[in-house]
């Protein structure tokens, strides 16, 4: 019978102490080691065929019915709406929620992810794609804890997803503007970086429709600089993007007939900048957002926005986790995942433009 590999064996092979091996293998999030040390220990464990022991629970005790939800911020009502959908369904099933607000801070996201090994929730939901540099880590966690992602997931990740077709949303927005005769338009967006591919997909979908109409050169794209995603001190950053970039746009041109915000929060900033410039909405310039958030429904808002049933997507993500818990397997086991979940809700407009 093959001898069971212990942390002491790994320590000898890696040339480090047994306590170092224990902390690295147990993913102690409050202790940091040199990257070389971590790699040495992980490689030694892999080569020796180390199998981590199953966690022991006290007799008669039950694992807490807990789900963890990762959010990039809680100032955009879109994420609050997703949370409401998740929490409503979780509550029906007797689960509690632990919300990790990463504020788009890579260090915070990494810290929360490493906490998962100790917290051991019954499921994890990402309300947007994990940051690119942590996709492998999320995949590793998904081997032991059910994970679901809301948004266009990375094709390299074998993790269940509720698909949000950002490209389609962009196309729908563009078609509506074209049908209304808007030829010269502007699109205001947050940073369009590799880290936030879903944003780029929405913009690309919009541009494709204008290109098909032979009007690609009539679309002005104004995207914020990447630094704004790091400026977590300002909780109203998306509103500021809309406001500041619209002021910049008005200094450059005055002949656009419509301005699109990537989401409602940006569109609110657009509207305030236009109001300050004494430009009437929608009489002079039409404004469009996306997500149909609470503020967009207020009586004095002349904002056209797209309803794509955000709360339902939250429920769907929670439903994936419940099904996976019930079937006692996670995404990367031999049994197929519940699905790469795709529920298509046909987007429709609210407060139509003129």
What does each model-identified segment do?
Residues 2-6, 45-78, 82, 93, ...:
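N-terminal helix-turn-helix/winged-helix DNA-binding helices
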Residues 17-22, 34:
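Short coil turns linking two alpha-helices in DNA-binding domains
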Residues 160-188, 204, 208, 239-248, ...:
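Hydrophobic alpha-helical segments within soluble ligand-binding/sensing domains
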Residues 127-172, 188-192, 265, 291-303:
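Flexible loop/hinge segments that line or gate small-molecule binding clefts
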Residues 173-216, 334-352:
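An alpha-beta-alpha
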């Amino acid at each position: 019978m093959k001898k069971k590999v212990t942390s002491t064996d790994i320590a000898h092979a890696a040339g480090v102490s047994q306590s170092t091996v224990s902390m690295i293998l147990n993913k102690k999030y409050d202790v940091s080691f040199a990257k070389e040390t971590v790699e040495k220990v992980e490689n030694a464990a892999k080569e020796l065929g180390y199998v981590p022991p199953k966690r022991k629970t006290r007799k008669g005790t039950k694992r807490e019915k807990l789900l963890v939800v990762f959010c990039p911020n809680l100032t955009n009502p879109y994420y609050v709406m997703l949370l409401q959908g998740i929490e409503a369904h979780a509550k029906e099933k007797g689960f509690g929620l632990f919300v990790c607000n990463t504020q788009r801070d890579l260090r915070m996201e990494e810290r929360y992810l490493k906490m998962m090994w100790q917290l051991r929730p019954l499921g994890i939901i990402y309300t947007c794609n994990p940051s690119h540099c942590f996709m492998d880590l999320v995949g590793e966690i998904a081997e032991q804890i059910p994970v679901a992602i809301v948004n266009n997931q990375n094709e390299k990740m074998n993790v269940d997803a509720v698909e949000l077709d950002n490209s389609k949303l962009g196309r729908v927005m563009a078609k509506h503007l074209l049908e209304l005769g808007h030829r010269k338009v502007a699109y205001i967006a947050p940073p369009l970086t590799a880290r936030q591919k879903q944003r780029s997909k929405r913009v690309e979908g919009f541009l494709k429709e204008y290109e098909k109409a032979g009007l690609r050169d009539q679309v002005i794209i104004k995207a914020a600089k990447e630094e704004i995603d790091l400026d977590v001190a300002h909780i109203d950053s998306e509103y500021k993007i809309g406001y500041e970039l619209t002021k910049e746009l008005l200094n450059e041109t005055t002949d656009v007939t419509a301005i699109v915000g990537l989401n409602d929060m940006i569109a609110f900033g657009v509207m305030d900048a236009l109001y300050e410039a004494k430009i009437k909405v929608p009489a002079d310039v039409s404004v469009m957002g996306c997500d149909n958030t609470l503020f967009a429904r207020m009586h004095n808002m002349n904002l056209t926005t797209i309803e794509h049933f955000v709360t339902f997507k939250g429920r769907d993500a929670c439903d994936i986790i419940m099904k996976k818990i019930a079937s006692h397997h996670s995404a990367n086991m031999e049994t197929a995942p519940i699905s790469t979940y795709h529920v298509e809700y046909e987007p429709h407009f609210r407060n139509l433009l003129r």
